[in-house]
């Protein structure tokens, strides 16, 4: 476990004035939130990837909130709400991924064993909906917070409620929702993209 990352997340959650925060933190500690991967083989597919991804989403979301305000004059969302939805949007991934011996072909085409992650959730309840369910067991999410977490997958979610114009309706009325989705995409495909050589980009100028 990355103790510095845990301390950062706990401090951020405790900064939100919401009954049940301490109980929520106890749940995070009792689960594998701080050690779980963010996926089995894509972004954050390593120990601690889930917590790291959640912090990256928070950073991107705060940046979007500030930028939209300064550049477009849009009102800022409540910072406490941003902290909650960013750090809890993938709560559904706790107690879901487990290590197992897997097989793959090496560069010579020969089979080799390795230890990788497999998805074996203790509770099957969808993605965003499960995150909302778990969070609401400890704190009371507002309607906008719950909606933001529920729809954070955007068009990647194939659930029925996404196919009846509700996704666009939610984004058009709830800035917290589209900022969370955009921040999730930024964190996944930019900050956590191993194909982007940031050192080369940062030294070109």
Model features per residue range: what roles?
Residues 203-205:
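Short acidic DE-rich linear segments
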Residues 1-106, 111:
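Acidic/His-rich, divalent-metal-binding segments that scaffold phosphate/diphosphate chemistry
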């Amino acid at each position: 476990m990355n103790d510095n990352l845990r301390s950062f997340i706990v401090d951020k959650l405790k900064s939100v004035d919401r009954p049940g925060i301490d109980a929520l933190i106890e749940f995070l500690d009792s689960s594998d939130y701080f050690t779980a991967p963010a996926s089995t083989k894509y972004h954050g597919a390593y120990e601690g990837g889930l917590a790291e991804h959640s912090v990256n989403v928070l950073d991107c979301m705060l940046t979007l909130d500030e930028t939209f305000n300064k550049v477009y004059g849009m009102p800022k969302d409540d910072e406490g709400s941003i902290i909650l939805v960013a750090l809890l949007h993938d709560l559904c991934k706790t107690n879901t991924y487990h290590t197992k011996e897997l097989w793959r072909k090496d560069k010579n085409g020969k089979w080799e064993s390795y230890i990788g992650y497999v998805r074996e959730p203790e509770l099957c309840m969808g993605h965003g909906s499960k995150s909302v369910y778990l969070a609401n067991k400890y704190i009371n999410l507002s309607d906008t917070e719950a909606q933001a977490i529920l729809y954070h997958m955007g068009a990647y979610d194939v659930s029925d409620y996404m196919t009846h114009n509700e996704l666009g309706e939610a984004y058009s009325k709830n800035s917290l929702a589209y900022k969370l989705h955009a921040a999730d995409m930024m964190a996944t495909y930019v900050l956590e993209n191993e194909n982007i050589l940031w050192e080369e980009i940062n030294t070109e100028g």
